[in-house]
A protein has these predicted regions:
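Conserved active-site segment immediately N-terminal to the catalytic lysine
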Residues: 151-186, 215-217, 222-227
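PLP-dependent aminotransferase class I/II
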Residues: 33-38, 43-49, 110, 114, ...
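Conserved SAM-binding loop
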Residues: 51, 76, 97, 192, ...
Length: 378
């Protein structure tokens, strides 16, 4: 069976994890946490990079830093993972769901402004499949309305918009190192980028359970105490050690994933040209980090049949998100009419993800491609 995903091991993870154990520093913010943070700051120019226990925690930190609270509204695409909305719901915010673009699952920037009210505080663009949203339009809207922008870059490591790294354009960026991502911190992990100098000190305090502990270890204060809200967002050194091994091989990982992505694209573009399905749309302003290769079928029944057919042929293809605006939680807690978001619903019904991981063999990619051609009778 060709799995949908398989976490890649570089071979150095266990060695670095042993080093972390041997030093006796396990609780975080040690050598490997600092190495990872420095990597992101130096490679991508992020103002401040803060390792977290998950991408969800990075989003929750961003929500706190935006001072989101009861009565505030946050604009989020409906076609996304629940964490994109949940982080702000936990602060008491009301979520305003936006539709996707017609040709890709990203938030439709042209529909954002109509959703803004005097209560709006944050826009959350989600870079689906690592492909950039229209950040020029989004930042222009945010600047004119004095709103925060929190980039959900969970899938977008090493991806760019007009030469700028994703996660480094809005006020905050949030990454995930879950085992399904291009690189992983041992199954779970995340990163918050703080791109506005005004928020760096408070971000460190929130990260350290509401204390100024980070300043204490830098020798800036002679003792530390409780100074603000916060939580236990700091990951273990074991997780950071695992991630460091992955980051050292990031270029190798990316090159292989892009080669697989390109094989899918070349092998299926003619079939897509016949109208059987559509493939990922990469705008000229964006780069492709090969996080995912997906197809958009013509309807739900066709997608269901394709997934079943590929399973019969030994390939693990899967669908993705359900529309959050149609979720049980949202309908139970939402006041007013449920929005109609047809593009989002179409991706929820029709999008299918193909196997994508570093060790996926070329011959297995060809099996998937051939099976899809056979499914459509071509």
């Amino acid at each position: 069976m060709i799995p949908f995903n398989k976490p890649f091991l570089t071979g150095k993870e266990a060695h670095y994890m042993y080093q972390a154990v041997y030093t006796g520093k396990l609780s975080g913010n040690g050598v490997f946490t600092k190495k990872c943070q420095q990597f992101f700051e130096e490679r991508y120019g992020f103002r401040k990079a803060i390792m977290t226990t998950s991408g969800t925690d990075a989003l929750e930190m961003a929500a706190i830093l935006c001072d989101v609270g009861p009565g505030d509204e946050v604009i989020v695409p409906s076609y996304t993972f629940v964490s994109s909305a949940l982080a702000f719901v936990r602060q008491g915010a009301r979520i305003i769901f936006a539709d996707s673009c017609e040709n890709n699952p990203n938030i439709d920037a042209d529909k954002i402004e109509a959703l803004i009210t005097p209560k709006t505080k944050v826009i959350v663009p989600v870079h689906y499949a690592g492909v950039a949203c229209d950040m020029d339009k989004i930042m222009d809207i945010a600047n004119r309305h004095n709103l925060f922008v929190v980039e959900d870059a969970a899938q977008a490591i090493d991806s760019y918009y007009k030469g700028k790294p994703l996660g480094g354009i809005g006020h905050f960026g949030c990454f995930s190192f879950h085992e399904t991502k291009n690189v992983t911190a041992g199954g779970e992990g995340g990163l918050l980028t703080v791109n506005d100098e005004r928020f760096i000190r408070r971000a460190e305090i929130i990260w350290e359970k509401g204390t100024n502990r980070a300043e204490f270890f830098r020798g800036m204060v002679n003792k530390y105490g409780w100074v603000d809200t916060g939580s236990s967002f700091l990951p273990s050194e074991i997780n950071s050690a695992f991630l460091w091994a992955q980051l050292e091989s990031l270029d190798t990982i990316q090159d292989r994933r892009k080669a697989i992505w390109n094989q899918y694209h070349e092998g299926l573009k003619d079939l897509a040209g016949m109208g059987s399905f559509t493939m990922p749309d990469i705008p000229k302003c964006a780069t492709n980090n090969a996080h995912m290769f997906y197809l958009v079928c013509r309807n739900l029944e066709e997608r269901t049949a394709l997934i079943s057919y590929l399973k019969e042929k030994g390939a693990g293809a899967v669908f993705h998100y359900l529309s959050l605006h149609l979720s049980e939680f949202y309908k139970d807690h939402h006041v007013g009419e449920i929005p109609k978001l047809p593009n989002c619903d179409r991706f929820a019904d029709c999008l299918v993800r193909l196997p994508m991981f570093f060790e996926l063999m070329d011959e297995d990619v060809q099996i998937v491609i051939s099976s899809i051609w056979n499914f459509y009778g071509k």
